[in-house]
From Swiss-Prot:
Keyword vocabulary terms for this entry: Coiled coil, Periplasm, Signal
Protein's UniProt name: UPF0194 membrane protein YbhG
Cellular component annotations (GO), alphabetically ordered: periplasmic space
Annotated signal peptide: 1-16
Assigned protein family: Belongs to the UPF0194 family.
Coiled coil (UniProt feature): 108-209
Cited NCBIfam families: PRK03598.1
Amino acid sequence: MMKKPVVIGLAVVVLAAVVAGGYWWYQSRQDNGLTLYGNVDIRTVNLSFRVGGRVESLAVDEGDAIKAGQVLGELDHNPYEIALMQAKAGVSVAQAQYDLMLAGYRDEEIAQAAAAVKQAQAAYDYAQNFYNRQQGLWKSRTISANDLENARSSRDQAQATLKSAQDKLRQYRSGNREQDIAQAKASLEQAQAQLAQAELNLQDSTLIAPSDGTLLTRAVEPGTVLNEGGTVFTVSLTRPVWVRAYVDERNLDQAQPGRKVLLYTDGRPNKPYHGQIGFVSPTAEFTPKTVETPDLRTDLVYRLRIVVTDADDALRQGMPVTVQFGDEAGHE
């Protein structure tokens, strides 16, 4: 009969030990697990045309989901198409001029220049002889000083024409100067740059979505004349999804880049999202008011960016999130 109370006593002791051990294990797990509070990062971007013009069409409205590469709107293309045609013509002219400079002068052009020199030489010889005769007549007082001056002027003009023809023939025979060829090449490159700019302007008269997102606001309507850079849409970026949280200096060593964490929301308290710390701010700041940790309000903390690896549409920007550290986060 004495054995029964002993057995019961042993059972009670064992049960108490199990309960105490379980409580100790639970407490140790809780103490080792760091909990932070943050929000799904709000990331928006203002979309605009890089060039100005009249809005021709807009393909999306507020609330629409957009995909990267999707056409969102277009300006009137006509002014940019005309500018492109002008730029192409400018390249053609500059290319032809450059090719002429490289090719040099033809034999026919050299022969014509030589003939021009011969003709200019004859004209100069005649003018020089005439001036010489006029000098003799002026000395004998047969002509006036004005007549002599006219003869001298004709001689000087014929001499200038001869020199110009000789210089031209010399240039034709030696080919174009390197400086002239370089100038023609520079003109061609300038025309090509203007063509590239015209092509880019035409391309930028179509507004393309840079990434996936949701359209928050549509600031203009078709027919609006915009200056370059004027906001057309405001888009909320949906990928990747980031959580912004803050950690105090005491726990900073636990929040290392690459560390895996669990993310809980009020709508999914029993089914966490998975995340990985991607960035830890190198500078401290005071805890923002949006962080729901009253005991840390006046503490200096470090901002974390946590990338959600299994995000879905249920995670909305600005949503409060609980960040759980611990062994279970690192092994799931």
